[in-house]
Swiss-Prot record:
Name under which the protein is recorded: Exosome complex component Rrp41
UniProt xrefs under PANTHER family: EXOSOME COMPLEX COMPONENT, EXOSOME COMPLEX COMPONENT RRP41
Gene: rrp41
The enzyme's E.C. designation: 3.1.13.-
Subunit and partners: Component of the archaeal exosome complex. Forms a hexameric ring-like arrangement composed of 3 Rrp41-Rrp42 heterodimers. The hexameric ring associates with a trimer of Rrp4 and/or Csl4 subunits.
Keywords: Cytoplasm, Exonuclease, Exosome, Hydrolase, Nuclease
Domain of life per record: Archaea
InterPro entries registered for this protein in UniProt: ExoRNase_PH_dom1 (IPR001247), ExoRNase_PH_dom2 (IPR015847), ExoRNase_PH_dom2_sf (IPR036345), PNPase/RNase_PH_dom_sf (IPR027408), Ribosomal_Su5_D2-typ_SF (IPR020568), RNase_PH (IPR050080), Rrp41 (IPR011807)
GO cellular component term, pick one: cytoplasmic exosome (RNase complex)
A biological process from GO: rRNA catabolic process
Amino acid sequence: MMGRPEGLKLIDENGKRIDGRKKYELRPIKMEVGVLKNADGSAYVEWGKNKVLAAVYGPREIHPKHLQRPDRAILRVRYNMAPFSVEERKKPGPDRRSVEISKVIRGALEPALLLHMFPRTAIDVFIEILQADAGTRVAGITAASLALADAGIPMKDLVAACAAGKIDGEIVLDLNKEEDNYGEADVPVAIMPLKNDITLLQMDGYLTKDEFLEAVRLAIKGAKAVYQKQREALKEKYLKIAQEVEGNE
């Protein structure tokens, strides 16, 4: 959260936000599954101005062998922001933030995966942020979960994610860049809706206990809406495949 420019209002007296949305409204979201031919699974997500590509490879053999787990697969996640993804060009390669978010995303996805079915292997997830506009970790989790499902990795449920936050004293859904920079708090949440489980819950900023609970409830509601979009994107891909198969008969 940064010091804000003088006179900047993030939300007006009618509850209208800086980008025209209402308090509890998500940014526009578009999802597509199976976008990379050479990956075992892949997905592309546009979320507001965020553009995120996720690719999954595996389960595959691990080298060196001492990294293998005899009882389960290991999940390796690499979250990377492309140098051109933000206005100020960033240095290529992982920085401390990317390493931290990679770990956070791995922790959010792991509870959904039946890793014991693939001992001594690795499942590699690559998340590339092509354009960043606040909420890249929840968009990354959402894209990675779709790519894992597309790769046919057995899962208890899809993982859907969304954030809520506080701007000008109001709890709102799905912060954009200005709200994230100049707001008071951000609460990203990831869930497995069918299991009623939370796999990620973080908070950046300051909230009272009541505000925190309201933000979590709102983020869960947003994640459930994201989950429906994930299911539609997967359905769309497999309807396409079915039509192609029928056409070839």
